[in-house]
Amino acid sequence: MRQSKKLGQCFLKDKNFVKKAINRAEITNKDVVLELGLGEGALTKELAKIAKKVYVIELDERLKPFADEITSEFENVEIIWSDALKVDLKNLGFNKIVANLPYQISSPITFKFLDVDFETAVLMYQYEFAKRMAGKPDTKEYSRLSVAVQYNADVEFICKVPPSAFSPKPDVNSAIVKLTKREPKYFVKDEKFFKKVLKAMFQHRNRTIKRALIDSSHEIEIDRDNLKEILEKVESEFDFSERVFKTSPEKIGYLSNLLYDEI
């Protein structure tokens, strides 16, 4: 079957990486697992041998022959023919996620996962995206994505995966990442406002926090002059001269709360 470029289909063929993903997810016979993208079923079959239940969300119904083969062999596999971004994940009751993600939906699907309860997710991403997810302050990988994902999950970069592990071979390297869901390590008063502050700051990651916020005041929906007044009012409580890329997530959370109290 010819894979769909539109759907970003690159099927994971290398069984070593399939096994690595499953091992790092620590799947047991008590786990209910969510997988995105059936492919030819290489990952699904291995999951089904161990897990209590496997839900697979797949959009491409041309893959039905593979689905029929798997569901006839494994009674614990259920295929959901739909767009993963539109499925209500809260009703599925899974506790783990293992998936080779379509790279064009990496960001929205990751944040959709983080909005629901799960224990562990072991996911395949484009290499550069994975590095940014795991980015730490004062590194070139540190980004808005780093702070947003690490707000309520621990991120572990497991390994780099070469194009040769897939069919067809993608043009980029990939990586396996493990997300462990947890409660936030710091408090923010309003998560939506926190995300707006993040966006405003990281549009200018090399500038000082003050300059970045003023230049992107529209992102936090505060008039530029009003924002200048607010920053002057709270400058005794925060160091606005620090560069954005050096600022820890905890400090950004604290700043978000300071600004939120003033609007």
UniProtKB/Swiss-Prot annotation:
Coiled-coil features, chain-numbered ranges: none
Subcellular location: Cytoplasm
Any one GO cellular component localisation term in the record: cytoplasm
Main location: cytoplasm
Keywords annotated in UniProt: Cytoplasm, Methyltransferase, RNA-binding, rRNA processing, S-adenosyl-L-methionine, Transferase
Listed GO MF terms: RNA binding; rRNA (adenine-N6,N6-)-dimethyltransferase activity
Binding site for S-adenosyl-L-methionine: 12, 37, 58, 83, 100
Entry-linked Pfam families: RrnaAD (PF00398)
EC number: 2.1.1.-
Known function: Specifically dimethylates two adjacent adenosines in the loop of a conserved hairpin near the 3'-end of 16S rRNA in the 30S particle. May play a critical role in biogenesis of 30S subunits.
Protein's recorded name: Probable ribosomal RNA small subunit methyltransferase A
